Amino acid sequence: PLPNPVQYFGFDTEKTAPQLAHYNTEGIVCPECHGILTYQLNTYANLGDYICESCGFHRPPLTVAVDELTELTNTSSHFKINGTNYHINIGGLYNIYNALAAVAVAHYFDVSPDVIKRGFDKSKAVFGRQETFKIGDKECTLVLIKNPVGATQAIEMIKLAPYPFSLSVLLNANYADGIDTSWIWDADFEQITQMDIPEINAGGVRHSEIARRLRVTGYPADQITENAKLEDVFTQIKGQTTPHAYILATYTAMLEFRELLAQEHLIEKEMN
C-alpha cells in the first residue's frame, strides 16, 4: 500500500454484543482467516463496527465518526459528527455516509465545521437521486436503484414517509442497468407490506419480473398494475388517489422517465 495518510470514517453510535449480520449479507468473510465477521454495530449491509472473533481482525479506530443520529426522515437527516451537529436536505441513512465521507476529506484539509455546514445547506437532490417534481397534483419523488443494497436502502428511506403514497418500480435490463436482474430477489421489497401503499405500478422492459417480485412479498396482486411503456406509468401516476408518489427506477428507466418528464415540461432536461 502507498504510505499516504489514512482517514477512517464510519458510525460510532449505540453498540451491542457482537452478532452476525443479516443472513443475506455479502462481504462478511474475514480477509485474514476467512472466519465470519460479527458486528457490535451494523448500520446496513456489511458496514459497521466489525470484528473477527477467531483472529481478532477488527475495524480500525475512526478518525471521523457519526456519534449520534438525531433525526432521520424521508427528506432530511440530523446527526452529529465528532460532536458537531450537521443537517442534510436529503433522506436516507446511506446519504449520511456520503456526508460523512465529505466531512472526512474536509477534516483532513482543516475545513471548519461552519464551512461544511454551509455546503450542506446548499446541497439538494439531483438527477434521479430523490429528485422531486409534480405530475398533475401529485408530489413525486424519483429514486435511482441499481443493486440490492441500494434498493433496500431506498425502500428503508421511503418507509419513513409519514403519509400514504403510490409506488412505481421501473425495471430495465440494458447494459447500463445490468442485464442480469436477479438482484431484485436480494433487495428487501418485503418491507412494502409494512407501508401505507394503496397501489403499485410495475413498469419498464422487465415489468413482469418486478411485478412477480412484488407479488411474492405478499402485497395484494390486484393492486399491482403492469405497464411496459413509461408513458402509461406516467398516466397511471397522474390518476392515482394518493397526493404523494415514489418512483424507484433502474438507471436507464430513470433516464427515460426523466426524458418523459422533460417533454412534459415538469423538469429541466439537464440539471445544474
Place the predicted regions along the sequence by residue.
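Extended acidic/charged loop-beta regions that coordinate divalent cations
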Residues: 1-85
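Short glycine-rich loop/turn motifs that provide flexible caps or phosphate-binding loops at active sites
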Residues: 9, 91, 202-203
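Residue-level detector of alpha-helix boundaries and kinks
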Residues: 15-18, 40, 87, 139, ...
